[in-house]
């Protein structure tokens, strides 16, 4: 999806970059940046984070999708307390790397989202931890989708605030953790709760970096990433920034050829989706055929598209 409120920029007469349309020189090239705040931008960000997390999981033998909850005894606030998770991940790092030299320390990339229950508004954490799986994993239950869920005394002792359970890292679980970007925008204040969700990633180990370092040639020669179901997805912005920084000459070639072709195909698909969404909207209204303004049409299409992507991201 394309940004609906792009930030326009260009050059003034002296060659400086300016963002005011009044100051932009018409004789020089102008361009636009995604706002990163509108619904399409937020959904794109969530999707890109999910793709990067899934790719990160492919680079390690062991990964877990972990849920950390609070019991009544340790629920000291109805707000998320970042220090609780921060101390947990530090204890895990210390436990796994105790006695090891800096060169031999085990990297522990993670992506975490803290949110509130839909009904109880109770705070809890969902974490993707890469390059780790506890040795004492015990089967806990099987979900309706047939996925095995485990528990671990090792992790419980490190968490100290309540119950824990974990499963496998898949594109679905990665999408679940990455959904914060769309959810925060959709509900404003995390549904009816007046507290925002928290999202963070490991600072030392960029999510997806190992994957793009290994597969950048295939990825940028195609101009897209291949998802587990065989479908094609856009190359995440982080991958593009990495490629531009580390392979500037190849980036220029990609930007001039493959990226242009990918953009044209994406725009064609976007127009098709908009027509389909509008047709569905008209059908939903019972075939009523009274005039709609351009704004009403755009909002109708966005709402339909947003609902589809919410379902896809399991919002």
Swiss-Prot record:
The active site is at 176 (o-(5'-phospho-dna)-tyrosine intermediate), 180 (o-(5'-phospho-dna)-tyrosine intermediate). It comes from the Viruses. It catalyses: ATP + (deoxyribonucleotide)n-3'-hydroxyl + 5'-phospho-(deoxyribonucleotide)m = (deoxyribonucleotide)n+m + AMP + diphosphate. Residues 253-315 form a coiled coil. Its EC number is 3.1.21.-, 6.5.1.1. Keywords: ATP-binding, Coiled coil, Endonuclease, Hydrolase, Ligase, Nuclease, Nucleotide-binding. GO terms for molecular function: ATP binding; DNA ligase (ATP) activity; endonuclease activity. The keyword Methyltransferase does not apply. Belongs to the microviridae Rep protein family. Plays an essential role in viral DNA replication. Binds the origin of replication and cleaves the dsDNA replicative form I (RFI) and becomes covalently bound to it via phosphotyrosine bond, generating the dsDNA replicative form II (RFII). In turn, viral DNA replication initiates at the 3'-OH of the cleavage site. After one round of rolling circle synthesis, protein VP4 is linked to the newly synthesized ssDNA and joins the ends of the displaced strand to generate a circular single-stranded molecule ready to be packed into a virion. This is Replication-associated protein VP4. It comes from Bdellovibrio phage phiMH2K (Bacteriophage phiMH2K).
């Amino acid at each position: 999806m394309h940004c609906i409120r792009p930030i326009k920029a260009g050059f003034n007469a002296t060659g400086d970059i300016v963002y005011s349309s009044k100051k932009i020189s018409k004789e020089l090239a102008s361009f636009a940046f995604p706002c990163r705040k509108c619904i399409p931008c937020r959904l794109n960000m969530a999707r890109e984070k999910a793709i990067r997390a899934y790719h990160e999981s492919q680079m390690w033998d062991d990964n877990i999708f972990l849920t950390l909850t609070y019991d009544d005894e340790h629920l000291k606030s109805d707000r998320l307390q970042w220090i609780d998770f921060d101390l947990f991940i530090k204890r895990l790092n210390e436990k796994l790397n105790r006695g090891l030299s800096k060169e031999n320390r085990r990297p522990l990339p993670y992506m975490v989202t803290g949110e509130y229950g839909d009904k109880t508004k109770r705070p809890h954490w969902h974490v993707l931890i890469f390059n780790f799986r506890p040795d004492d994993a015990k089967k806990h239950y099987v979900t309706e989708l047939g996925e095995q869920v485990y528990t671990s005394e090792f992790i419980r002792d490190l968490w100290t605030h309540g119950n824990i359970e974990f499963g496998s890292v898949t594109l679905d679980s990665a999408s679940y953790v990455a959904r914060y970007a769309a959810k925060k925008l959709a509900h404003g204040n995390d549904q009816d709760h007046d507290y925002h969700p928290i999202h963070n990633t490991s600072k030392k180990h960029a999510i997806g970096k190992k994957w793009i370092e290994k597969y950048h040639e295939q990825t940028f020669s195609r101009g897209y990433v291949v998802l587990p179901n065989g479908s094609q997805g856009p190359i995440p912005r982080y991958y593009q920034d990495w490629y531009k920084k580390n392979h500037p000459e190849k980036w220029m070639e990609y930007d001039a050829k493959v990226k242009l072709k990918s953009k044209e195909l994406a725009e064609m698909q976007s127009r098709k989706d908009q027509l389909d969404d509008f047709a569905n909207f008209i059908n939903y209204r019972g075939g009523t055929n009274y005039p709609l303004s351009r704004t009403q049409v755009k909002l109708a299409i966005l709402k339909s598209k947003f609902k589809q992507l919410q379902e896809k991201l399991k919002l």
